[in-house]
A protein has these predicted regions:
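Bacterial N-terminal signal peptides
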Residues: 5-15
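Bacterial Sec-dependent signal peptides at the C-terminal "C-region" and cleavage site
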Residues: 13-23
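Soluble non-transmembrane domains of integral membrane proteins
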Residues: 21-185, 189
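Channel- or pocket-lining gating/hinge segments that regulate access to a cavity or pore
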Residues: 185-228
Length: 228
């Protein structure tokens, strides 16, 4: 009898555990263009591809860009007009989109002119909380177009960071607990090159100092010139 109860307990426990596991979604980003860093308005523009690979019943592509200011477009990056996911040999479903938009970033200039910045693009799925859906980084999921150059900046690479975003609020719905969502952040590392500091800051200062010293060394017969 005890063995029967034990087996029944196991049978009930296993489905519960399987149901408790959130559906994982492998996510990757390929940055095409980055431009118009506006430190006064704390914003930047980005153009990139984002893809999703998953197994399960939930379609994870109904995403929200948490720090988006303007989203110009979100187009499925296929040419056959079919909006259904692609079935991979691994048994996973696959979708890829191309995104263009303007995003918020709070620029810190404490280390100007040798400042460094970590721009980020954050996504969440507002339809499914973290206990149902979880975004994870795909293998080699953070990439930058190898011909992408930004004048006045050095590209220091990119990475994907995931976490659970706990809002600490049920947003006015008394029947819901505090909302927690899987948050995926694509981070782009930028730094001003040393040449910017030398050419834009030190060189003009050095020229002014040379002119000032040269004026002091003028012969007294050129006093009028020195005074000027």
């Amino acid at each position: 009898m005890r063995h029967l109860i034990f087996l029944l307990s196991i049978a009930l426990f296993i489905p519960f555990q399987a149901h408790a596991q959130p559906q994982q979604v492998k996510t990757g980003v390929y940055l095409m263009n980055l431009y118009d860093l506006n430190m006064d308005e704390h914003s930047f523009y980005a153009d990139f591809y984002i893809w999703f690979k998953w197994k399960g019943r939930i379609d994870p592509t109904s995403i929200e860009f948490v720090n988006a200011i303007e989203k110009w477009s979100m187009d499925k990056a296929t040419f056959d007009g079919d909006s259904t996911p692609v079935s991979l040999k691994t048994g996973e479903k696959y979708k890829i989109f191309r995104i263009e938009g303007r995003f918020f970033h709070s620029f810190s200039l404490n280390r100007f002119p040798l400042d460094q910045h970590q721009l980020d693009i954050q996504i969440e799925n507002p339809e499914f909380p973290a206990d149902s859906l979880q975004y994870v980084a795909d293998t080699m999921g953070a990439q930058i177009r190898n011909t992408l150059n930004m004048v006045g900046w050095d590209m220091k690479g990119s990475e994907i960071v995931t976490k659970v975003h706990d809002y600490g609020s049920n947003f006015g719905n008394p029947e819901e607990n505090a909302q927690r969502y899987s948050n995926l952040s694509y981070q782009i590392n930028l730094a001003r090159p040393l040449s910017y500091f030398l050419l834009k800051m030190l060189l003009p200062l050095f020229i002014v100092m040379l002119v000032s010293i040269g004026g002091l060394l003028l012969h007294p017969t050129h006093i009028d010139s020195r005074s000027s």
